[in-house]
């Protein structure tokens, strides 16, 4: 059943397509998180992402179909200048740090500033402390991380790609927030300005019936 006040776009027979970008330093486990979520795979060896990789996931959340396009970006310093290419038109951003690495948490703050500067408050932010399987080696306090996330309007999560903890909850909650944001835009679009607010973020609201098999084409709306 559509959420109250969700409008016509939340009705049955339609799908949302959202773009999500993962940002963070190298070695914090961004690729491991995405592979665990999309393919339920985990590799103990470090996987280095060169520039960016792209995966998709289809979901049904409360009767609403969601097509996720997930961009996993490189963490190495030499690739940071490419960030705007990948997070442009994103509906959500997952900013990952390693709970055993204080510097990786501080670098997340730089990404938050950049995203807010480039995309304003229209993007849904998640700050994620990964590798909680190494809790005994933690160097980032839970209170500090959660307080910071709240101060910048983000939600904070803890995950372990190795143990498959917290990842489903992270993506599910982010999807719900992106749907809510899109619905606010739909309600605010006004007479005759169809999907104007959603278009600002690159949200695609698709009539599934004539293009039920074309979800992959609608996933990658990077403008």
Swiss-Prot record:
A motif (Switch 1) lies at residues 41-54. One of its GO terms (molecular function) is GDP binding. A motif (Switch 2) lies at residues 74-92. InterPro entries: P-loop_NTPase, Rab21, Small_GTP-bd, Small_GTPase. It is an enzyme of class 3 (hydrolase). Its EC number is 3.6.5.2. It is found in: Endoplasmic reticulum membrane; Golgi apparatus, trans-Golgi network; Golgi apparatus membrane; Early endosome membrane. A lipid is attached at residues 219-220 (S-geranylgeranyl cysteine). The modification N-acetylalanine is found at residue 2. The keyword Hydrolase applies. Interacts with the cytoplasmic tail of integrins ITGA1, ITGA2, ITGA5, ITGA6, ITGA11 and ITGB1; this interaction is dependent upon its GDP/GTP cycle. Interacts with RABGEF1 (via VPS9 domain). Interacts with ANKRD27. Interacts (in GTP-bound form) with VAMP8 in response to starvation; the interaction probably regulates VAMP8 endolysosomal trafficking. Interacts (active GTP-bound form) with TMED10; the interaction is indirect and regulates TMED10 abundance and localization at the Golgi. Switch 1, switch 2 and the interswitch regions are characteristic of Rab GTPases and mediate the interactions with Rab downstream effectors. The switch regions undergo conformational changes upon nucleotide binding which drive interaction with specific sets of effector proteins, with most effectors only binding to GTP-bound Rab. PANTHER family: PTHR47978. This is Ras-related protein Rab-21.
